[in-house]
């Protein structure tokens, strides 16, 4: 196994075998299921091991701590968007072309959004979403030998961070608007000059 991502007090491992990948995902599902019955902060590593039927030794081969399980769950949820929408050359391309799917996907993952909101970790979802999209785009360009257009990553960063911010605000409103209205709002924000929104920003 090799380290997949390391940050402030966050470390989990990229699995190179089906067995370890399955164990990692089992811990993630167990954490998600456990939050049905008790707050995230009250769940211990020992509980995750007991509920999953896996040992503490296995846990610490895959994660440093419980928070890393949550980060892995976020990352893998982001990655599974590709499965939700079907095959494509680029996840970023689908987000740009099919925002309706993106909003629908995150409505389906309300439980994860609940955990992040209750633990004040919503910003982590935004950070991991942007990192994943940029990394995925770089890999696609490298694979096909495509040169990067000027400001391409800046534009993608602007779009994805804005779109995920809309998802978060939509969640905070308890998904008060249908997906179609969220897409309409997104289009207005994208194609209306910023000065048009100044009167709302100043209030």
What are these regions (language model features)?
Residues 31, 73, 77, 81, ...:
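Hydrophobic recognition helices of helix-based DNA-binding modules
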Residues 21-32, 36, 41-45, 50-53, ...:
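An amphipathic alpha-helix adjacent to DNA-recognition modules
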Residues 108, 157-169, 187-191:
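An amphipathic alpha-helical interaction segment
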């Amino acid at each position: 196994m090799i380290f997949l991502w390391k940050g402030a007090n966050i470390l989990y491992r990229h699995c190179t075998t089906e067995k370890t990948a399955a164990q990692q995902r089992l811990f993630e599902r167990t954490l998600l299921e456990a939050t049905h019955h008790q707050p995230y902060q009250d769940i211990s590593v020992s509980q995750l091991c007991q509920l999953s039927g896996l040992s503490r030794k296995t846990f610490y081969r895959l994660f440093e701590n419980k928070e890393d399980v949550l980060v892995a769950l976020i990352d893998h949820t982001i990655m599974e968007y590709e499965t939700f929408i079907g095959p494509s050359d680029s996840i970023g391309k689908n987000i740009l072309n099919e925002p309706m799917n993106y909003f629908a996907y995150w409505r389906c993952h309300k439980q994860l959004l609940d955990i992040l909101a209750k633990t004040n970790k919503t910003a982590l979802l935004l950070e991991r979403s942007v990192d994943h999209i940029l990394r995925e785009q770089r890999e696609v360009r490298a694979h096909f030998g495509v040169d990067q257009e000027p400001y391409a990553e800046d534009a993608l960063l602007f779009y994805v961070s804005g779109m995920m911010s809309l998802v978060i605000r939509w969640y905070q409103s308890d998904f008060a608007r249908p997906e179609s209205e969220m897409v309409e709002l997104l289009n207005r924000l994208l194609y209306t000059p910023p000065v048009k929104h100044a009167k709302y920003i100043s209030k």
